[in-house]
């Protein structure tokens, strides 16, 4: 079978790739020196920027860049992720905890020289409260706000309708009022036409070309101190092999989302350090619950059989997560259970032995029989319409793990009598938002405070109408879940709140619309002859890319031996191609296995 042939190839990939990458490194050594001796830190990325507007962006690459451009009221400490000052130096609740007063840092300026004041924060939040388009990305943080005012340049007051536990973790970029008040339509403004973009974070965005590069320069007046590199460049590589080759040649400083084969090959490379740390993401299989809008209108074309909870549980019962971790992730992941990764121990939940949907294909078959989806004479499960069931799984065309997992699902579910069609696209957003899928590979990065990733499964996150775009991830709308969400948001006692969050995870698990298969590690690499030191988050066994803060790129110290990567190609928007020798040597099957994960999920 194709699947088994693919598996055998993957078991040989690490040795073959190691030899190929080593050969390419020997054949094409390159100095890591820019023409003008600027210290340039170049980060290879594969995920496209969805928007440079912090009011619209949801993808990881975009939100990571926004953390560099704009200050938030608070930040997360890189050691243990507790709340630390950001734009606000302190925050104090009233006795009833319905009014929060923030002291705004005095003496700081926007990159155009104008002072940063509490009025900027007040305007940002009020805009989100009064314009649904401005609430697209982060509206859940302000949905409980009653009133926001700025009595003085250094005082921000937020009044709440009900207690809200996230007041020290409002992950909302504060923007300059004098710039953004000129925007007429927040749904269409992507903040990508005029440069430099005015901000107050550690970096100033000075250049951007879609699917080519994002260029940032140090904010010399940043209150924590200016970054030490002269330039930070996010350079786009659609192909993971090209990014790895560029790292070897010194054309980039950092590459993330490495495949196990790439990580293994790079371990022995001179001047390259591989970082393999527990990740902050989950990798899941989302099931279409019947796409709907907040006004009650139904849309999309999800298979009706998936509305039966027994069917959803049977499908997940036929997923061998141990095999996925061992064969697809090759040990660089942990088996999935609850919604929140084990890295966040306070909120990590796992099902009891009686609740767990363990791998049991025989039991899955019996469950489908009980649900009325029995096999016909050809061994195919038949739906209520009398037709054989064939599920479409939406996957990312640039993601080899989606494809590899999809092949396993094809084999496992075929044994159940269920067909699978992998619908692998460069752009999964359009069919997803339209509800035109049966199942989909899904994943999100989780923040130290999990409120946001919890909020995207509430009824309030649904689009207003089928023509609108909501904050929902998968159109889930469950009253029991919503009730628990409201309870956790209003609970200030940390232990009690964690217990409620775990009940929410239990509810999601039982519903079967969000089946977590794995928690992938953050596997990444950087050149030590370009980067002398860099902060991971958490500092012990943490990741570099996609942090809950700006710590990595802000803290990075240039290596004394080099001047950073050569950014000459990015200045003209040219994307470096893959090393020709590697293309010629790597066959189609090996090439597929070599490719790294091209995205941390497009919807992240």
Predicted regions and their residues:
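Short Gly/Pro-enriched turn/cap motifs at secondary-structure boundaries
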Residues: 63-64, 80-83, 192-198, 204-209, ...
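Long beta-strand-rich cores associated with HINT superfamily self-processing modules
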Residues: 526-565
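Short, solvent-exposed loop/turn elements at domain surfaces
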Residues: 50-56, 81-84, 166-169, 214-215, ...
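Surface-exposed binding/hinge segments that line
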Residues: 96, 103, 137-183
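C-terminal segment of classical bacterial N-terminal signal peptides
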Residues: 23-32
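N-terminal lobe/hinge region of extracytoplasmic solute-binding protein
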Residues: 44-95, 126, 198
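Extracytoplasmic
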Residues: 36-40, 47, 68, 86-88, ...
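Extracytoplasmic/periplasmic ligand-capture domains
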Residues: 2-11, 105-136, 148, 202-328, ...
